[in-house]
Amino acid sequence: IFTPEYAEKESGVKADMIVEIAHKIGEAGERFASHNWRAAGASNLGGWAVARCLHFLTVLTGAVGAKGGTSPNSWNKFKPTQPNPPAPQKKWNELHFPKEYPLAFFEMSQLLPHFLKEGRGKMDVYFSRVFNPVWTYPDGFTWMEMFSDETKFGLHAALTPTWNETAFFADFVLPMGLASERHDLNSYATHGGTWVAFRQPVLREAARRNGKPVSLTYEANPGEVWEEDEFWNELSWRIDDGTMGIREHFMSPYRPGEKITIDEYYQYTFERVPGLPEVAKAEGLTELEYMRKHGAFLIEPATYKKHEQEGWPTPSGKQELYSKTIV
């Protein structure tokens, strides 16, 4: 029954136009590039199938991972290696990932205040990070109601770069840095290669270059704005005296038993960027010094057809249009 005429009836697109598009896609072959960014996949009954069908066209033309085709964005993004990472969680908070939505890929935070209101549980301590649900979500009034009830949110700390509606309902408002006030790694799927860039807090780096280094970023930032990484390091060491299994994930990889610093964190990461140690050494620099100086590093100029060697991260190692795992 799946004819061009049937598709016209379902979609409103003329049958002859559908046939013409199909021929053009076939002619493009491996140079067919397309993907579904929300669009019909969001808020439509059966919309989840749109991305599957569109990707199947890429499969049929052999364009998956090909030059001029469509690649997984993870092929073009650098994934950093962190010191002392915790083991994956063995269970989840059903206030964030409710049983009603077993295939949810992201935390369904828009439902949280409604679950609290139903009496499903309590958030003893809640950090809202660069997040303004009172304004952003459709039912901001329920968030306001729950934030005002200490039996639902015991303590609410808002980590935010701005004063906003959600911060108004917080017990603590903790100013977080904007782009020029913090360290970050950047790596985006901008083209067929893979790269990593290093964002640095401007005033801290300026102070270091002028011979006036600081220990913590907030000492250089206006308004004592904290570096998030340092905030979590400090908070974790204050929460855990070493008996709770938290502090061990915030230890220096170079000074056993000591608290990790922001410089050590990024030095550890950059030491493990493929090709960077050799390039930095050629300039007489450490990996961190190289990234401070240059700001970016090209890891791979092109990343095509990796699946031919690595397969896919599915039970079968193949792309699964029909998946026994989901069924």
Model-derived segments and spans:
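Non-catalytic alpha/beta scaffold blocks inside enzyme catalytic domains
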Residues: 1-33, 37-53, 61-66, 74, ...
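Short connector loops at secondary-structure junctions
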Residues: 64-93
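Intrinsically disordered low-complexity regions specifically enriched for long asparagine
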Residues: 88-95, 101, 317-322
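Structured loops at beta-to-helix junctions and adjacent beta-edge loops in soluble globular domains
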Residues: 37, 60, 129, 315, ...
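Conserved hydrophobic/aromatic pocket- or pore-lining residues that grip, position, or stack substrates
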Residues: 57
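Disordered, low-complexity tails and leader-like regions
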Residues: 83-88, 185, 302-304
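Long, low-complexity segments enriched in small/aliphatic residues
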Residues: 255-327
